[in-house]
């Protein structure tokens, strides 16, 4: 168990809860070289699940969940993330599979962060 990954997951969970009203139920993160790869389970709120019952609704929820997160991170890195990682966040790639309620985010930093090849589920 890595305290660093646990704290990283908490930053992600807190931000998404503030932004969408619901954070992921479970997050699994691995550090690989200069990347943190996070798989997020149980992301959608009850209202998002209701909206996603139609193809148009799924598209709307997908756009909101991906574009909004990427836009937010491009404007301001979440508080404490760069300090925790000891590196600057340079890119975020994010996608969500609405039907499965699973999202993946790849955080790319300006230097190597995986010294200990850490992985943790929380």
From Swiss-Prot:
Pfam families: MpsC. InterPro entries: MpsC. This is Uncharacterized protein YrhF. It comes from Bacillus subtilis (strain 168). The gene is yrhF.
